[in-house]
Amino acid sequence: MLRPPARHGYASCVHRIFTTSFASVYPLYVAKAERKGRTKDEVDELVLWLTSFERSDLERHLADATTFEQFFAEAPLNPNASLITGVVCGVKVQEVEDPLMQKIRYLDKIIDELAKGKAMEKIQRTP
């Protein structure tokens, strides 16, 4: 059976990442940062900045293996998240149609920026 082609906005289907546990991807974010000389603490700082979670919230989500969908449903997203722009996986994050996929791409983008050596102050956007 053939699948319909994926669209840039992902609005037409439930993407597999939505049901993937945040805890299963989190170590990949940390590993990516550490390979480039950055730290787990910096990854945590960015996750906390984006989600407006407390550290205890992050630890709970990791322990409970909540899905990305649940993770972002509970996250009071940082009001400056919409200032995150750029391309992840060939898609401009500011043009992603599905709100959940856009939040996931925001996270991917700021972790990419961290791994590329961008200063924390620049990654954590301010108007």
Predicted regions and their residues:
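A charge-rich, low-complexity, intrinsically flexible signal that marks solvent-exposed coils, linkers
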Residues: G9-P127
